[in-house]
Regions:
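Active-site-proximal segment of RNA-dependent polymerases
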Residues: 84, 88-146
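Conserved polymerase palm-domain catalytic core
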Residues: 122-226, 230-246, 250-252, 256-263
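Short, low-order "capping/linker" segments at domain edges
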Residues: 268-274
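Beta-rich nucleic-acid/ligand-interaction surfaces
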Residues: 106-114, 230-233, 262-267
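Non-catalytic, polymerase-adjacent accessory regions of viral genome-replication enzymes
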Residues: 1-44
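Reverse-transcriptase-like RNA-dependent polymerase core
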Residues: 46-68, 167-183
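Conserved pre-motif C helix in the palm subdomain of viral-like polymerases
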Residues: 69-100, 189-217
Length: 274
C-alpha cells in the first residue's frame, strides 16, 4: 500500500484503541464486533482506495448551552464515529505543528482546569490596576468557517505525507451538505466544521494557527481553547484589533455578547471557571 496515511490509519493498534473507546461511548457492540473482523476492515480499505467509501449523512441533535439556548451538533453513525475518531487522532499525530502551542483544546493531557490555572497565575503576576486584557468567544465558529479553509488544511496534510484515499473520504464528507434533522427528514445545508464530528476537533485547532501565532507574539499572555480566547497584557488593545481584522478576512467574527474586558478588581468566568 503506497498510501502512507491510509496504511497508518489501518494499523491494528489504532483500531483496538478506537474499539475500546467505542465500548465506553456506548456504541452498539454488534457494530464494534464487525470492526474487529479483518475482512471488514480490508473491505473498507478497498472501498476507500477505489473512491467508493462514503461517510453517511449525520443526524442533528440540539444540545442545551449555559445561557439557555441550544446548539446544533451533527451525530455520525456508529461505524462512522469510529472511522472519524481514528482519522482525527491520526491527523493530530501527523501534523503536530499545525496546532499552535497557545491552542490547548482537544489534546490529550490538557484540560480546561489546567488552562484556567495557568491563566490565573498569569493574571496574578500582572501589575497595575484597570483593564488587564480581554476574553472573547467566536460567533458560531463551528458553523461559519468557509470550505476553502477546510480544504487548505487537508492540502497541507497531503503536501507533507502524500496523497491519501483517507483524505479523499474526509474531503468528500465535508463537501456533502446532507443531514437528517430531528424528525429524520433528509435536509441539506452547509455544515462547516460539522460540530459533533470527531474531525471537527482537529479542524477547530488548526484553522486559526496563523492568528494564534500573531497574537502570541504580542506583549502579553494569549491562550485559546477551541472558540474561547483570552489575552492578558499590555498589548490587549492591539490584540483585539488584530483579532477582529483577521477573523473578518476569513468571513468570521466575534460574538459581541461574549467579549469582556477584564478588570483587576472584578471576577470573571473562563471555560466554566470563575
Amino acid at each position: 500500500m503506497s498510501d502512507k496515511i491510509l496504511q497508518m490509519f489501518f494499523d491494528i493498534g489504532r483500531w483496538k484503541k478506537a474499539i475500546e473507546k467505542g465500548v465506553l461511548k456506548d456504541i452498539r457492540k454488534d457494530q464494534l464486533i464487525r470492526l474487529t473482523d479483518e475482512h471488514t476492515r480490508m473491505a473498507m480499505a478497498d472501498a476507500m482506495i477505489r473512491g467508493k467509501y462514503e461517510i453517511a449523512p449525520p443526524h442533528t441533535a440540539q444540545i442545551p448551552t449555559e445561557n439557555g439556548e441550544f446548539r446544533t451538533v451533527y451525530i455520525n453513525e456508529p461505524v462512522d464515529r469510529v472511522v472519524l475518531g481514528i482519522a482525527n487522532d491520526l491527523l493530530f499525530e501527523l501534523m503536530p505543528d499545525m496546532v499552535h502551542p497557545s491552542c490547548k483544546s482537544y489534546q490529550s493531557g490538557i484540560g480546561c482546569g489546567s488552562v484556567v490555572t495557568e491563566a490565573s497565575r498569569r493574571i496574578a503576576e500582572t501589575r497595575g490596576g484597570g483593564i488587564l486584557g480581554w476574553k472573547s468567544d467566536l460567533s458560531k465558529y463551528f458553523d461559519s468557517v468557509p470550505i476553502r479553509y477546510i480544504d487548505e488544511a487537508f492540502d497541507k496534510v497531503e503536501a507533507r505525507h502524500g496523497r491519501s484515499s483517507l483524505i479523499d473520504v474526509l474531503r468528500k464528507y465535508y463537501h456533502n451538505d446532507l443531514y437528517f434533522d430531528e424528525d429524520n427528514r433528509l435536509q441539506a445545508k452547509y455544515q462547516s466544521l460539522k460540530q459533533g464530528c470527531p474531525v471537527a476537533s482537529w479542524l477547530a485547532d488548526v484553522l486559526l494557527h496563523d492568528l494564534d501565532e500573531e497574537l502570541s507574539g504580542m506583549t502579553g499572555y494569549y491562550v485559546r481553547y477551541s472558540d474561547d480566547m483570552l489575552f492578558i497584557g499590555k498589548d490587549y488593545g492591539k490584540a483585539m484589533q488584530v483579532l477582529e481584522q483577521r477573523l473578518g478576512e476569513k468571513s468570521m467574527k466575534l460574538n459581541p455578547k461574549k467579549v469582556e474586558y477584564l478588570m483587576s478588581d472584578r471576577w470573571f468566568k473562563f471555560l466554566g471557571f470563575s
